[in-house]
Amino acid sequence: MRFKAELMNAPEMRRALYRIAHEIVEANKGTEGLALVGIHTRGIPLAHRIARFIAEFEGKEVPVGVLDITLYRDDLTEIGYRPQVRETRIPFDLTGKAIVLVDDVLYTGRTARAALDALIDLGRPRRIYLAVLVDRGHRELPIRADFVGKNVPTSRSEVVKVKVEEVDGEDRVELWEREGA
């Protein structure tokens, strides 16, 4: 793959997540009954950051859960016979809550669909929102994000890589081109 561009640096990521945090509280009319669920892998630290921002400006803690969607994916045969199943940890009852699913990139919509299936198996939320740092387009399913850090129109030959300090050692969003594309 060939590096093309930096789409967001650390301060830009922070500002986007801070804005998303405000938009979430505004849409929910406060923090009552609100909870965040980060999708493995990079959605988890993003969800925790959004929760910290909400706690900063609202003075109230918002619970955060962790969701593994591996067994809900529709491409298991394409990713190998031994998928790596990680922990799902949602330390609160979903029933009646406004849940914000948090992921790094929205592309085809298949990850979000799998996350919705997994969540609904765990309870019956009052409302489910989707928050993403980057929406790159190219939907294959009728899914859209409610909260978006940055819309980045891409070609199918391009790859958006989100790096987060907690996983990758730095905060940065990059655009890459697949070789031979």
From Swiss-Prot:
A Pfam match is: Pribosyltran
Q: Which UniProt keywords apply?
A: Glycosyltransferase, Repressor, RNA-binding, Transcription, Transcription regulation, Transcription termination, Transferase
- Please indicate the residue ranges that the annotation assigns to the motif PRPP-binding: 99-111
Q: Which reaction does it catalyse?
A: UMP + diphosphate = 5-phospho-alpha-D-ribose 1-diphosphate + uracil
**What CDD domains does its record include?**
PRTases_typeI
Q: Which GO terms describe its molecular function?
A: RNA binding; uracil phosphoribosyltransferase activity
User: InterPro entries annotated for this entry?
Assistant: PRibTrfase_dom, PRTase-like, PyrR, PyrR_bifunctional
Keyword Signal appears in the UniProt entry: no
Which Gene Ontology terms describe the biological processes this protein takes part in?
Answer: DNA-templated transcription termination; regulation of DNA-templated transcription
Q: Where are the transmembrane segments?
A: none
Domain of life (superkingdom) = Bacteria
Functional summary from the UniProt entry? Probably regulates transcriptional attenuation of the pyrimidine nucleotide (pyr) operon in response to exogenous pyrimidines. In contrast to pyr attenuation in Bacillus, PyrR from Thermus could act as a translational repressor: the binding of PyrR at its proposed recognition site in the transcript would prevent initiation of translation of the leader peptide, resulting in terminator formation and reduced expression of downstream genes. Also displays uracil phosphoribosyltransferase activity.
Q: Extract the PANTHER family matched here.
A: BIFUNCTIONAL PROTEIN PYRR
Q: What is this protein called?
A: Bifunctional protein PyrR
Which source organism does the UniProt entry give?
Thermus thermophilus (strain ATCC 27634 / DSM 579 / HB8)
